[in-house]
Regions:
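C-terminal regulatory/interaction regions
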Residues: 163-185, 200-205, 220-279
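Flexible, acidic/histidine-containing loops and adjacent segments that form or flank the divalent-metal
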Residues: 1-155, 239, 243, 255-279
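Short, surface-exposed beta-strand/loop "edge" segments at domain boundaries and coil↔beta transitions
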Residues: 72, 157, 248-250
């Protein structure tokens, strides 16, 4: 089990916090004896256990879109196969170690894809960077990511985690908000990866603001194909919010393009938190 944990660790050269100075979320929850999933009496949180919007605080509601129970079962099956493949077939009484191994193992078995086909170039129109967005993320780890709608003061915010936008996802979203809807904000799935979003979703579900949360170092997210599609195909004014001043954000921050396609770019500076006020 220690070997699995060590294999899942990202080296200090790749991240600022190493294994000696940080812990997985699951370990912190276990150590501090924080009760999990109280709104479902300890059961899994998925679209099967929270059918309707749930009031988590006064006038604040949450509607869970995914994962489905099928996604959770597939994740469990893959986890077991990975453990067997590493000759791990014995019982571990140390719950903290097992929790840590589970999280690190999921990091290791995530699918990896080829880099985007378009390279940043100063010439031409933004539309030339739009991709077909037809390839789909097949990672069950990402499919099992929690996605939900947060609602407050008649405003809805769509948080997509690392979710995969597929037919099941669109069907569930349609049941909650209808065939089309304009959100106050959408957190892009999987840091803006082109494998996790579709043109159909972009056309049907728009927002005042789109959030792209990544430093772009590990997988070079977001994909320019995704950003170009969001900007060019949604004609309403929108803001693309980046928490880091990444190259693709700087590339899109062109006055000519912003005027033509009715958008603005907001970038963080790594030191200060970006705050959004919708009151």
């Amino acid at each position: 089990i220690d070997k699995i944990i060590s294999q899942g660790v990202i080296s200090d050269s790749q991240q600022k916090i190493g294994i000696n100075s940080g812990m997985s979320l699951g370990v912190l929850i276990t150590k501090n004896k924080i009760a999990l999933n109280t709104i479902t009496s300890g059961k899994l949180i998925c679209d099967n256990t929270l059918y309707d919007r749930y009031e988590i605080a006064k006038n604040i509601y949450i509607s869970v879109i995914g994962p489905s129970i099928d996604d959770i079962v597939l994740l469990e099956d893959q986890w077991k196969k990975e453990m067997v493949s590493q000759n791990f077939m014995f019982r571990v009484n140390n719950k903290i170690k097992m929790t840590e191994a589970f999280e690190y193992q999921l990091m290791r078995i995530k699918s990896h894809y080829s880099p985007e086909s378009y390279k940043i170039c100063g010439d031409g129109d933004l539309k030339k960077y739009i991709g077909d967005l037809s390839e789909t993320d097949g990672s069950i780890v990402n499919k099992s990511s929690i996605s939900f709608i947060l609602e407050y003061n008649e405003k809805k915010f769509l948080f997509l985690g690392d979710s995969v936008i597929d037919e099941r996802f669109l069907s569930k979203l349609k049941k909650i908000v209808g065939n089309q809807y304009h959100f106050s904000a959408i957190k892009l799935p999987h840091h803006g990866s082109r494998f996790n979003i579709t043109h159909e979703f972009i056309h049907r579900y728009t927002a005042d603001e789109y959030y792209c949360s990544t430093n772009s170092k590990k997988y070079n997210h977001p994909d320019l194909e995704t950003l170009a599609a969001l900007i060019c195909e949604n004609t309403k004014f929108k803001k693309i919010i980046f928490n880091y001043p990444i190259k693709k954000a700087l590339f899109l921050d062109k006055t000519q393009w912003k005027n033509k396609y009715n958008y603005d770019i907001v970038m963080g500076d790594e030191k200060n938190t970006i705050e959004r006020n919708f009151l």
